[in-house]
Amino acid sequence: LVDAAHVAGLGIIMDWVPGHFIKNTDMLAQFDGTPTFEYTDPHRAENVRWGTWNFDLGKAQVQSFLISSAMYWLDHCHLDGLRVDAVSNMLYMDYDAGKENDRNRFGGRDNLEGIAFLKQLNTKVFAKHPDVLMMAEESSAYPKVSAPINTGGLGFNYKWNMGWMNDTLKFFEEDPVYRHSDMNLLTFSFMYMYNEQFVLPFSHDEVVHGKKSLMHKMPGDRYNQFANLRTMYVWQMTFPGKKLLFMGSEWGQFLEWRDWSELEWVDLKDPMNHKMQTFTKTLNHIYTNRPSLWQQDHEPLGTKITMADEPDVMSYIRYGKQKDDFTVVALNFVPVQKDHFRVPVPSLGTYTILLNTENLDFGGTWTKWQATLTARLGDHYGEPAWLDVILPAMGALLIVPKKLQPLPKKLATEHHQRPAA
């Protein structure tokens, strides 16, 4: 199956759970009548949060079993990577309920055996499979999760940005009337976006067990729910970090995910769901074909925040490595159109709108918009020029340069010396 996916151009990354296991007596629990894989101490063995047993990651047989498991999936099943589940549970002594006062032999809260195991795991994996992806689902502020081991890191390629995900969903679930006072939910992520190499996840965990689907989380009537969803996806696809979107979310499935049932494929007969799928497909193609949206995800020069202190709106610029390769992002988080909205840009010349979320083909109402935008000289939010645009209600624009012109010499020198935010 994995090989067939590879032929079709698909990579496969599997959810892998090395931190804890089920209590069934026909599985690993009390494997030989004694706590073989779990801790001997019942207090440390018990995982109250999930009703499972914690692996004793300090035991040689446990390390061998788990690393052999990982290598089996990579060696024999040809997986392209592993998403390591619940890493926080392996990093801390006091992560679980009832263990708030647990400490290691040095008096700290770090789980020394768990940290050593994760480093050993990544060392073994990359020694044999240097091109696979190892991703940590880790929700704390533990440092250097995605840094190399020889620099003090855990050695993962990427860390899931759970903070970005939680803040984003909290913001977009909110009635737009109140969003102006909660813009910090979005802007706070800019403060730590380079701390790790991040994945921005809208995963299965957020659309199950009564949490509702992404579509169902959105406020307003059906039209505005789709508009919110399109805008949120632009925010995700243009924010620094790799992207993850759970199946069914690409067309706005209304029911949350049920592991005993297939997706609501019938939704695609609805014009709005079909248009939502078209939008997601278009956004994906734009992302893959514009290096400025991904080439410098982890470099400060790759993102410049131009407007983040205004109520209800935001603007920033993503830069690629090539000269004049940049994408301007303008977002409107309320259902009120912004006429003559000034978008800061770094250069004079002409620009074009690459994506308008309110395009009729995507489920919006717009059939036409400004074909060419001409930048006007004048300092605006630290940029030397600005564009006069109509920013759609509850929508977003992606704007790209068409034909740029040099700035006046004095301005060019001044702005060349300004570091990217």
Where are these regions (language model features)?
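Substrate-binding/active-site clefts of carbohydrate-active enzymes
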Residues: 1-110, 389
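Aromatic- and glycine-enriched glycan-recognition loops and surfaces
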Residues: 1-11, 60-65, 112-119, 224-227, ...
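Conserved, mostly hydrophobic/aromatic
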Residues: 5, 15, 66, 73, ...
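Structural preference for beta-strand elements that scaffold enzyme active sites
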Residues: 11-13, 80-83, 131-135, 197-199, ...
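Glycan-recognition surfaces
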Residues: 31-47, 108-226, 230-238, 281, ...
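Alpha-helix termination/capping residues and helix-transition junctions
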Residues: 75-78, 128, 238-239, 348
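Aromatic/acidic polysaccharide-binding cleft in carbohydrate-active enzymes
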Residues: 86-96, 100-101, 140, 145-159, ...
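Carbohydrate-interacting/catalytic domains
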Residues: 223-226, 237-245, 249-421
